[in-house]
Amino acid sequence: ASDVYKRQVPIVSKVTGISLARHATEIMLGKKLKSMNLKPRPCRFIGVKEAVFPFNMFPEVDPVLGPEMRATGEVMGIADNFGMAYYKSQEAAGCILPTSGKVLVTVSDRDKKFIEPIARDLISLGFKIVSTGGTAEYLRGQGVETEVVNKLHEGRPNLGDMITNKQIDLIINTPVDRTSMIDDSFIRMQSIQKKIPYMTTIAAARATVEGIRSAQHVKVSPRSLQEYHS
């Protein structure tokens, strides 16, 4: 079986409370599905799976993803709502989302229309937004308050100084044009070295907002699988 599918089985089993491996073995041994008394069951909680990457062991390597397999494992967060489940999944992967502080936002032109509501949500949650020139110009044009920071080639102080000095608590950076490749690569590598959570897609940024919102309003606490399935 594919390694991908083999990793899905235990995760799906934990979320559903059904031992898929055991039932699959029984079927291979000749048992019929009808005799297993399997019935649809409502799921009262949400599970979010997250991949674990070893980039922290290679701080000089750009953590950009490609077609090759780089994940060394997977973790999962379970909670009563998506936001908390996502927050737990990030925490389990070693990426603890902040509940306050400054967010560096620098996105491609195609993502600017999507980042505006995310920036507004972050401000409503108590965060301050820091953006590079193009992103800041767009956000300000939409009435979103943001601090402007220089890119690496635009002089000091710049975004590199803020990251190095740990003045940034969260990074939202989507891939942009070739002229920004050096900045993007630096941001990704520095975020790992300084243990700053970073998001490289709009979908991840939206999920992060939901996770932070849940963590601000509900205490993050562990629960056993037995409690979830009782």
What does each of the following model-derived ranges do?
Residues N150-K151, L159-S230:
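Peripheral docking tails and interdomain loops at the edges
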Residues C95, S100-F127:
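Glycine- and Gly-Pro-enriched alpha-helical subdomains that act as flexible
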Residues S2, P10-K14, N37, E60, ...:
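Short acidic, glycine/serine/threonine-rich loops at helix termini
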Residues S2-T99:
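ATP-dependent carboxylate activation and anion-phosphoryl transfer catalytic cores
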Residues G126-L139:
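Short internal beta-strands
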